[in-house]
Amino acid sequence: MSAIGTLQVLGFLLSLARGSEMGNSQAVCPGTLNGLSVTGDADNQYQTLYKLYEKCEVVMGNLEIVLTGHNADLSFLQWIREVTGYVLVAMNEFSVLPLPNLRVVRGTQVYDGKFAIFVMLNYNTNSSHALRQLRFTQLTEILLGGVYIEKNDKLCHMDTIDWRDIVRVPDAEIVVKNNGGNCPPCHEVCKGRCWGPGPEDCQILTKTICAPQCNGRCFGPNPNQCCHDECAGGCSGPQDTDCFACRHFNDSGACVPRCPAPLVYNKLTFQLEPNPHIKYQYGGVCVASCPHNFVVDQTFCVRACPADKMEVDKNGLKMCEPCRGLCPKACEGTGSGSRYQTVDSSNIDGFVNCTKILGNLDFLITGLNGDPWHKIPALDPEKLNVFRTVREITGYLNIQSWPPHMHNFSVFSNLTTIGGRSLYNRGFSLLIMKNLNVTSLGFRSLKEISAGRVYISANQQLCYHHSLNWTRLLRGPAEERLDIKYNRPLGECVAEGKVCDPLCSSGGCWGPGPGQCLSCRNYSREGVCVTHCNVLQGEPREFVHEAHCFSCHPECQPMEGTSTCNGSGSDACARCAHFRDGPHCVNSCPHGILGAKGPIYKYPDAQNECRPCHENCTQGCKGPELQDCLGQAEVLMSKPHLVIAVTVGLTVIFLILGGSFLYWRGRRIQNKRAMRRYLERGESIEPLDPSEKANKVLARIFKETELRKLKVLGSGVFGTVHKGIWIPEGESIKIPVCIKVIEDKSGRQSFQAVTDHMLAVGSLDHAHIVRLLGLCPGSSLQLVTQYLPLGSLLDHVRQHRETLGPQLLLNWGVQIAKGMYYLEEHSMVHRDLALRNVMLKSPSQVQVADFGVADLLPPDDKQLLHSEAKTPIKWMALESIHFGKYTHQSDVWSYGVTVWELMTFGAEPYAGLRLAEIPDLLEKGERLAQPQICTIDVYMVMVKCWMIDENIRPTFKELANEFTRMARDPPRYLVIKRASGPGIPPAAEPSALSTKELQDAELEPDLDLDLDVEVEEEGLATTLGSALSLPTGTLTRPRGSQSLLSPSSGYMPMNQSNLGEACLDSAVLGGREQFSRPISLHPIPRGRQTSESSEGHVTGSEAELQERVSMCRSRSRSRSPRPRGDSAYHSQRHSLLTPVTPLSPPGLEEEDGNGYVMPDTHLRGTSSSREGTLSSVGLSSVLGTEEEDEDEEYEYMNRKRRGSPARPPRPGSLEELGYEYMDVGSDLSASLGSTQSCPLHPMAIVPSAGTTPDEDYEYMNRRRGAGGSGGDYAAMGACPAAEQGYEEMRAFQGPGHQAPHVRYARLKTLRSLEATDSAFDNPDYWHSRLFPKANAQRI
């Protein structure tokens, strides 16, 4: 550290001892506000400075040093460390201003409106006396204000000071010019910055040398040498107790932002409690109590209360409290700090009805006789009587001139206190001088002079002041504060009889008569001394309290020989003059006075005591009985009349309540109709050009004044979503809406104009997309949609996963696919499809949201940043991640992830993986793992959505068809393991929402618009609850179906080695050769060896696995027992035995208006056979046994369909078909990616004991009749090719019993597959397996 740094530290340590005692005991003295005006000569100025600032450390105000001589010893100023106002040094002759400990000038008041230090004209033109040095060696902080130092002929080194290091405000004005020249240079250790020539005069730098990490001051150049934020003027360490001065407040040596509050929060009781360590803010110091001449306002020591508060005395503490009603009037005084210098004719009317003078009162000769210079006329002496209402003066009272005919100051006869918070000249609070005609003071009510000195001089006729005991009036020693001289001698006053009244005590008096006594010798009555009180005789009778006579209440009866009362109230009388009502003496008994329960009537008894009348008396009484009532009717109200009156009254009340209810309901219905009118009505946008067609846009163009945002619901990649209200222009209704604010962060695009894409988004209307109510162009685009209080489907499935059943999940998948198909028809690419962007309109209807938003932004804003946390990488297709390519087929990929979220009840995809790792995993062929509740059929639909080749992925039309088919038999495709009681049907789904949530949704005004639809859905839910009655075993998923991957990973690898050697791992247990389960890369349910899709074929990995399983089983001929409790097992066999029924007419589809698919639960006994099916084959020929040979099984597995009835023709247009109904062939399903593959070998069923083969045959082959196919499938948009057909599978319901065990039949080996064909990242493999060409051959 350099030498200057060493000196800085030494300087700091030198003052540390005094700095540590900053908050414990500080000598605080008041400042002045005289400016350049002075009274008296240089000696008087010096004496004033000495008395004000001797041993002073903190100046509460301004330090003004003006017109001081050259021989003045100012060493008493060396203890001043802080000035709260400004420092003024002007017109002085001394050579050095010794303020070596001054550290901080706060600048709460600034000179000339902008300067905290003002130094000017400190020299004598007629001599060599002049100011040569400002010894401010410790000054390091000016909190407010600038610096002005000019025209000081001998003052040196001011231009060497770095004032920017001292001044805190960066733009403060600094003027330093025209000062002394030919000054000696700074000492070399000061490096050009000094207050004087010596090495001890170096400037201490505490800001410009600091490291950038420091916010304020520092004690060294290193980053760890920063001062505390509450420090001002530097520090010796980093703590708040190491500050040389405090920026805000000093609390016992520690710098704090505020003093301890009067109330503190108790964490145990959760309440605000009084703080036992409360302190008050007195200037920059926290004190335990304010000075006696200040008042407490909350936690501040103030000179006067604010205008809306009044001063009260609480437990000896003067406090400011809000006035109850009109406050005592406080008026501004005169003198320093006021706009008036004296009381004169121009301002005396402002003192009318004043009870308190805030400041001072000055009576000067220019005020009484007038001021011709300022054109102020003379004062009318009678107007001085306005001061008779004054009770307190907070400053000083200065009377230097008084009207000649007024011989005392009796206009101040009610003045009780002179506060002395601001003092005159040399510290006077009461100054009376040069009043030649005044004979007495007349301050008969004055009780206290809180601070300051008393100066009474040169009043030639003044008497009575000699007798006053000033110690009763003054706080502190009276000898040092009294300066009474040059008045009329005491002997002359006594000779003329101008002495105190004999009734006055030894305390003296203010003038002649018993009313001017400072205190009384005997008693006083209303301020006048008396010899005795009228206790036993005289009028009015009185009682005595602390030597004061107080009158009894007028209702007291005067007593002879004893006291009449013992207090001033009506309850303190010994005897009443008229009547007594309880303890009080009254002029008359109460008659009709309103009480808590009605009018009160009383009568006087024989002893003049007031007694209550009967409760039925309404006009008074003369006795306690009912017959004593005055004005009572002869016939009282009978009981029947009372009953009639009560009945009529209640009827009127009910009519009023009923009318109010009907009025409220009518207004509510009216508001609902208005809301429906605004929400359902679209707007036609007129063409801009005659050649353009009119565009029917359902959305509106809103004005910003019609929308009001309430709270933020969330934020995403493209903007922020707010909950708000729409107030249509000219209407009073408030419609709850969702407002999505889209902003262009680059600022290159504005949304002032309505584009074609905006109109295209506004024209979309579908049951399964969130309709856009309107948009508001501007600097940011605001999209307005209907507010759906049920929230997103993601939050819903997470909260209600225990109550959701397979029917709801599959129907939601259908509705999402239909909504996306509608967007595809209108060439709208979503780009951000995820479960969070699917909203729940009702418990059974969902809608896709946030579509078309990305196209509203410029191309650069749609580029993907893998590091951006909000970019939906996990939902995006590979071509979108790598190339930013977004198509309807990339939305299909996102749809697969959305369905995966739905089937995992809101799990996060690829949990635990960084976003940058996901593209590499997808390229390696790894995909999300099979959800636990999904069969292989549902999972394979997801896998097809995640194909690398986008052309191989299914379309939304095919996806809607596939999920519609699966929704007919939900337990067959989704197995949700959930505990159910014996009396609860396992297939009956509970409500996805609680009763309270449904009620809250119904209370939302926007949900009332779909009231009719919700009623239909409630009826539908009731039908579903009774219709879905399957055996308990159909909902039970075997525990053997578990993923081999860690649940936290959230994906499954798809590039694994083939399973060709899996069948070789066998073990011999109990003499039987049993197969060990092959190492699967995705869960395979037990009891399901083939695909459960209705097309009857298997995909690539499945076919490969089943071929090897078939080969192993055909060699070993094992008979492993398998459970038969899985509905998928029965439905698989049933698909081989059930004929495909013709397509039902569109009018018979079991689907409600919201896309909710009804499960096919109406069972029929039989149905007509169809050529090419296996319905006519007997059980013995279809179900293989152990004795059957392999040739028969092989022949069965290679059996082909003979033929099919002709398919219905393809509809001519989408309007003929409608997107709700997608066409399928009568015999072949247009399911996703189906192909005609080999039928599988059936599995032999070995019934358990007690079950006959006939019963089993009847149970397993039960199917519907022809009439049951009416609601089987929804019509699809186009017929598939013949090569892509597959057989139809139907759900069925058993009679309530089932075989407990099943055994696998011997399976014949199918066509072998090469290992190279089974790679999941080979598009040719998937294309050949899932989507065969037209010339593919069947086997």
Swiss-Prot record:
Superkingdom assignment: Eukaryota
Q: Could you tell me which residue ranges are on the Extracellular side of the membrane?
A: 20-641
| Main localisation | membrane
Topology in the lipid bilayer is annotated as:
Single-pass type I membrane protein
Q: Where is the Protein kinase domain?
A: 707-964
Q: Which keywords has UniProt assigned to this entry? A: ATP-binding, Disulfide bond, Glycoprotein, Kinase, Membrane, Nucleotide-binding, Phosphoprotein, Receptor, Signal, Transferase, Transmembrane, Transmembrane helix, Tyrosine-protein kinase
Q: In which tissues is it expressed?
A: In the muscle, expression localizes to the synaptic sites of muscle fibers.
Membrane spanning stretches: 642-662
PTM comment: the record says: Autophosphorylated. Ligand-binding increases phosphorylation on tyrosine residues and promotes its association with the p85 subunit of phosphatidylinositol 3-kinase.
Q: Which GO terms describe its molecular function?
A: ATP binding; ErbB-3 class receptor binding; identical protein binding; neuregulin binding; neuregulin receptor activity; protein heterodimerization activity; protein kinase activity; protein tyrosine kinase activator activity
Cytoplasmic-side positions:
663-1339
Show the CDD domains listed in the entry. FU (cd00064), TM_ErbB3 (cd12095)
The record's GO CC annotations read:
apical plasma membrane; basolateral plasma membrane; ERBB3:ERBB2 complex; extracellular space; lateral plasma membrane; plasma membrane; receptor complex
Here the segments flagged for biased composition (Acidic residues) are 1185-1195
In this UniProt entry, which cysteines form S-S bonds? 186-194, 190-202, 210-218, 214-226, 227-235, 231-243, 246-255, 259-286, 290-301, 305-320, 323-327, 500-509, 504-517, 520-529, 533-549, 552-565, 556-573, 576-585, 589-610, 613-621, 617-629
Its GO biological process terms? cell surface receptor protein tyrosine kinase signaling pathway; cranial nerve development; endocardial cushion development; ERBB2-ERBB3 signaling pathway; extrinsic apoptotic signaling pathway in absence of ligand; motor neuron apoptotic process; myelination; negative regulation of cell adhesion
EC code(s) of this entry: 2.7.10.1
- Signal peptide per UniProt: 1-19
Query: What does its UniProt record remark on the domains?
Result: The cytoplasmic part of the receptor may interact with the SH2 or SH3 domains of many signal-transducing proteins.
* Subunit structure, as described in the record: Monomer and homodimer. Heterodimer with each of the other ERBB receptors (Potential). Interacts with CSPG5, PA2G4, GRB7 and MUC1. Interacts with MYOC. Found in a ternary complex with NRG1 and ITGAV:ITGB3 or ITGA6:ITGB4.
- Database matches in PANTHER family: RECEPTOR TYROSINE-PROTEIN KINASE ERBB-3, TYROSINE-PROTEIN KINASE RECEPTOR
Describe the function of this protein. Answer: Tyrosine-protein kinase that plays an essential role as cell surface receptor for neuregulins. Binds to neuregulin-1 (NRG1) and is activated by it; ligand-binding increases phosphorylation on tyrosine residues and promotes its association with the p85 subunit of phosphatidylinositol 3-kinase. May also be activated by CSPG5. Involved in the regulation of myeloid cell differentiation.
Indicate what this protein is called per its UniProt record.
Answer: Receptor tyrosine-protein kinase erbB-3
Organism of origin: Mus musculus (Mouse)
